[in-house]
Amino acid sequence: MAASLIDPSRAPVAFGRRAVPQLFEELQQRPEAARRQRALNSLCDLMHDPERVYQTVTGGFLEQVKVLFQDEDADVRTKTCDLLHVLTSHSVGRQALLSSSLLPPLSQLLDDPSSSCRRSVHRVLKRLTLLPAGADALLTLVPKLMLKLRQEKEEEEVQALILSTLSSCSYQDPRPALANDGVSLLGHILSHRSTNIRRRRPSLMALSVCRDGKEQVCEQNLLPVLVGLLQDEDLEVQVNAVGVIMFTVTITTGKQQCLDLDVLPVLLDFVPKKKEEEEEQDEERRRRRKALVLYSLRALAALAEAPGGRHLLLEQLPVLEARTESEEDQDIRRSAQSAIHVITWTP
């Protein structure tokens, strides 16, 4: 009866604090591939416990996985990356990996022949960008990640992971992505058939923060596509599109292009409090709806700096005033007040 309870995909685990050292010792003995996989599976299970993560980090065991990156067995390489993925779900694990010498050999697995291994590597990299130091450490990989997107050889899940990593890196420093034709590449993704991919455009928003990025958005003629995405059925796609527009209309060319595209009515339509906004129970969707309103108000304030925009918005003041009179959210109230101040300003 007891034998039937043993999981054949896991290695036997020692009791207490001997568990982690024992499994790493087994890996160092270079047993056959099946035993290495079982040991790694058991380690993955243990890494869900913060105490085991701390023991692994402080005990110097992390560096021992480096040799497994070059293992001849693809499943072993994949399981090794899976181990790091679980470990980096903890802040101490992310910090330890960033402080180790594992990043260079780990990044070499981005070209691994196994798609499962490459996917696991991208999951680890995305986890590392949860820390600003992680995003900063991965900036040197931006050109390689951009190339992988451009080649379009990876499956959709991996493309989404790459876009998320690029987004975090670009918020840290947009220059590497901009230098590698990032606006053009990410602009191509705007019309991707997959909603999951279109949602990952915060990376384009990150590039549009700096002036060079704003100018490239205008030069690449991306604003018509972004304005069209304001009508997308997916809320997150709308939020990201408004975010890029919000940054781009702070330059004169962006203002004029958006006014020519008649974007004001669409942005104004996002401002009034809607029934679904009041009834929304999901906290994440409430956050996104708030971002949609805030970004729209800030874009309207920037467009009001142009004479043509101010003239049109003066007729729509009641829409904005309504969000200052009955609005409970202080961020939205202040943004609406700022927009009104710009619209009604006179020399």
PLM features per residue range, with description:
Residues 1-347:
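Long amphipathic alpha-helical tracts in eukaryotic proteins
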